[in-house]
Swiss-Prot record:
<feature type="region of interest" description="Disordered">
    <location>
        <begin position="493"/>
        <end position="596"/>
    </location>
</feature>
<dbReference type="Pfam" id="PF02752">
    <property type="entry name" value="Arrestin_C"/>
</dbReference>
<dbReference type="InterPro" id="IPR050357">
    <property type="entry name" value="Arrestin_domain-protein"/>
</dbReference>
<feature type="modified residue" description="Phosphothreonine">
    <location>
        <position position="374"/>
    </location>
</feature>
<keyword id="KW-0597">Phosphoprotein</keyword>
<dbReference type="GO" id="GO:0031625">
    <property type="term" value="F:ubiquitin protein ligase binding"/>
</dbReference>
<comment type="similarity">
    <text>Belongs to the arrestin family.</text>
</comment>
<dbReference type="InterPro" id="IPR011021">
    <property type="entry name" value="Arrestin-like_N"/>
</dbReference>
<feature type="transmembrane region" description="Helical">
    <location>
        <begin position="194"/>
        <end position="211"/>
    </location>
</feature>
<dbReference type="InterPro" id="IPR014752">
    <property type="entry name" value="Arrestin-like_C"/>
</dbReference>
<dbReference type="GO" id="GO:0030674">
    <property type="term" value="F:protein-macromolecule adaptor activity"/>
</dbReference>
<dbReference type="GO" id="GO:0005737">
    <property type="term" value="C:cytoplasm"/>
</dbReference>
<dbReference type="GO" id="GO:0005509">
    <property type="term" value="F:calcium ion binding"/>
</dbReference>
<keyword id="KW-1133">Transmembrane helix</keyword>
<feature type="region of interest" description="Disordered">
    <location>
        <begin position="363"/>
        <end position="387"/>
    </location>
</feature>
<dbReference type="GO" id="GO:0005829">
    <property type="term" value="C:cytosol"/>
</dbReference>
<feature type="compositionally biased region" description="Polar residues">
    <location>
        <begin position="405"/>
        <end position="420"/>
    </location>
</feature>
Length: 596
């Protein structure tokens, strides 16, 4: 008795700790697409006194066992046994290697960590059937010296699979619909294909009788489990297989005796929360488990005889981590079914949804709305952003607020560097001159207050662009002479023709200065003198009109495109048109008229 008590008091604590809740390892994805899953933990040992050990090790072993018996008239006893057992995974850790010499562990606490990456195609745990199973066990061993017994600690762990996030085929609604000619048209659907063991399956029925006075009787719902076992070396070394079908759950509704041209109802089929009653879907080497929903609808015909409508839907059952928790966690599977089995919205119901406006506008990848001329699909229900003034103002306010938030403390908005966030705002240019050199230097700075996002986002229509004659000048044009300035300088550098008065010069690329009253009087007197001279010398009126037309062209050497107020009807050779052009240009008094 003293020896036994001494053995028990050597270690006050000896356990295998797994870094997973409920000792449950969840593998994300199916066997053909899952990534490696980590398994880690530690072996903890608390010694009350010093002991002498040879080695300390840990071993992870996964075993698969398939066994069943079947009657056989040729075998004594009438039973033929098929059995196969093999190791599906094995991993060893040596914490204290065996070297032949003993090692003394003093009293205290010891912890030996372990870690392994389990392959994605590893077989998951299968438990609950007597004929087959796949189990994983951790076994820690401490080999002691002399007559002391070996210290062994075992821990059972489970490996389960969870559906990947991109498994769309398991989250979509599945249904079966058909028409029984001259009898009934039916649709039976479930919201998703995959369900958690311990939850429930909502089943929706839509029945439309095609025969007058046809009524719906009882509706039967049954969940079937199909198990297929196979061994490569069974009785006498021969391969053998076995198919087994069992009923997991069943439900039957009451008869619908009332007459109607449309029946629609939903029934919930609760799933068991025990692996003994229901297993998960799996496809392993030698073990295959599938599930199906079977439906049977009784139809009462007008003549009194009963017809039966049958249909089936395949479903996938998965093991949830909550199944191994306490009772409250298991009950949450049914209470929170909508969060576990919420199907994704269909494309038809979501294609016209408006984007969420509460996001940050700092990383916009799309340009601002281009205006009412943006192409748009016919009969489209999508929002028209060009006509939505509130949305445009909200966008401008958000961009301006973001620019102010990104400014460092102590800096004005004009001191923003364009290299910080070049995509936030279009740059605003400030042109200055270098007083020391006299050369103009362009200092590009960002100024959100001077930038009109509303103007930048507007694109004129084709009609407005073709009618507008005012050129859109860039702020950089002031550093280099424009084409109009060069043409005007060349025109002024030429010697003036005799009898031609130089018109007032243009002071800016976008407008002209009207002539003064003295200039108009000098022009009137000069034209009167020329007319009297031409009359006395025999000059024809065509020469006079040509000189007036030349005077009109000299006042605008760049053509009518640079001066929008110039009439486009002025042409050389027409005396009336030349006078009208000069009068409209305010270069002739209103009382001046053509003299014959």
């Amino acid at each position: 008795m003293n020896i036994l008590s001494r053995k028990e008091n050597v270690a006050s604590y000896f356990d295998i700790r797994v870094a997973a809740e409920h000792d449950l390892i969840v593998i994300q994805g199916l066997a053909d697409s899952a990534e490696p899953t980590p398994l880690s933990g530690s072996v903890v040992l608390c010694l009350n006194e010093a002991i002498s050990v040879k080695a300390i090790s840990l071993k992870l072993v996964g075993k698969c066992r398939i066994s069943w018996s079947e009657p056989s008239p040729t075998v004594r006893g009438g039973q033929r046994h098929n059995k196969q057992e093999y190791v599906v995974y094995e991993k060893n850790w040596i914490f204290v290697p065996y070297t032949g010499a003993n090692r003394t562990l003093r009293a205290g606490n010891y912890e030996y960590p372990f870690h392994v990456m389990l392959p994605g195609d590893i077989a998951e745990s299968v438990e609950g059937l007597q004929s087959c199973y796949v189990v994983y066990r951790l076994k820690a061993s401490i080999d002691r010296t002399g007559l002391a017994s070996k210290m062994v600690k075992k821990k059972h762990i489970r490996l389960i699979r969870a559906l990947p996030a991109d498994a769309i085929e398991y989250t979509q609604t599945i249904s079966v619909d058909n028409t029984w000619p001259n009898k009934i048209e039916y649709t039976i659907s479930v919201p998703t294909k995959a369900y958690a063991i311990g939850s429930y399956i909502p089943i929706h029925f839509v029945l439309v009788p095609l025969l007058k006075r046809l009524t719906i009787g009882k509706i039967s719902i049954t969940l079937k489990e199909y198990i297929t076992l196979h061994v490569a070396h069974g009785y006498n070394g021969l391969p053998a297989s076995k198919d087994e079908v069992r009923t997991v759950r069943s439900l039957q509704t009451e008869e619908l005796e009332e007459f109607s041209d449309h029946y629609e109802l939903t029934k919930n089929l609760e799933l068991p929360s025990s692996l003994v009653e229901c297993l998960q879907d799996c496809d392993l080497d030698g073990i295959k488990i599938r599930h199906k929903l079977k439906f049977s609808v009784s139809l009462r015909n007008p003549d009194g005889h009963i017809s039966e409508l049958r249909a089936a839907l395949p479903v996938v059952l998965m093991i949830p981590p909550q199944l191994f928790g306490d009772r409250a966690e298991v009950e949450s599977l049914r209470e929170n079914f909508e969060s576990f089995n919420q199907p994704l919205p269909s494309y038809q119901n979501s294609m016209y949804d408006r984007l969420y406006d509460g996001l940050s506008y700092s990383n916009l990848d799309t340009p601002l709305p281009s205006g009412a001329t943006t192409p748009r699909r016919r009969d489209s229900m999508e929002p028209t952003y060009a006509s939505n003034e509130a949305h445009r103002r909200q966008l401008i306010a958000g961009l301006t607020e973001l620019a102010l938030q990104q400014q460092p403390q102590g800096r004005s908005p004009n001191e923003h560097s364009p290299s910080n966030h070049p995509e936030d705002f279009p740059p605003s240019f400030s042109l200055g001159s270098n007083p020391s050199s006299g050369a103009a230097s362009a200092v590009i700075t960002r100024n959100p207050s001077e930038t009109s996002l509303a103007d930048l986002s507007r694109v004129p229509s084709y009609k407005e662009a073709t009618r507008s004659a005012v050129p859109l000048e860039s702020p950089l044009q002031s550093t280099l002479p424009s084409y109009e300035d060069v043409a005007r300088i060349e025109h002024l550098s030429r010697p003036p023709s005799p009898g031609i008065v130089t018109p007032p010069q243009r002071t800016s690329p976008s407008f002209f200065v009207s002539p003064t009253e003295s200039t108009r009087q000098s022009l009137d007197s000069r034209r009167s003198f020329e007319h009297s001279t031409s009359s006395s010398s025999g000059i024809s009126p065509s020469h006079s009109s040509a000189s007036l037309a030349h005077l009109s062209q000299a006042s605008n050497p760049n053509g009518s495109s640079s001066a929008p107020h110039r009439p486009t009807s002025a042409r050389v050779g027409s005396h009336r048109n030349a006078l009208d052009a000069l009068r409209r240009a305010r270069m002739l008094p209103s009382g001046f008229s053509r003299r014959n």
